[in-house]
């Protein structure tokens, strides 16, 4: 797992541990994640953020984007208003 997702994952785990789903109803984290209706809005937002983070880690087009090559023919032409000596 990438380091950038680790913090979000820890925050999500902490949120789940302190939610009524796990703390009061004594359900497992897996059960709470399946029934998102029982979770507070903060946990739901962290679930979405964690999923987005994982998707970005796998999306190679966003990880290594190379700038398009410039057309060198246009760059080497002399401007028409320059006098040749």
Swiss-Prot record:
Family indicated by similarity: Belongs to the PET191 family.
Residue window of motif Cx9C motif: 43-53
PANTHER family, per database record: CYTOCHROME C OXIDASE ASSEMBLY FACTOR 5
Gene Ontology biological process terms from the UniProt entry: mitochondrial cytochrome c oxidase assembly
UniProt subcellular location: Mitochondrion
Location of the region described as Disordered in the Swiss-Prot/TrEMBL record: 65-85
Cellular component GO terms held in the UniProt record: mitochondrial intermembrane space; mitochondrion
Protein's UniProt name: Mitochondrial protein pet191 homolog
Native source organism of the sequence: Schizosaccharomyces pombe (strain 972 / ATCC 24843)
InterPro entries, alphabetized: Cyt_c_oxidase_assmbl_Pet191
Motif interval(s): Cx10C motif: 21-32
Pfam family of the protein (one): Pet191_N
The protein's role, per its UniProt record: Involved in the assembly of cytochrome c oxidase.
Limits of the CHCH domain: 18-61
Domain of life, source organism: Eukaryota
Disulfide bond entries: 21-53, 32-43
Key words of the record: Disulfide bond, Mitochondrion
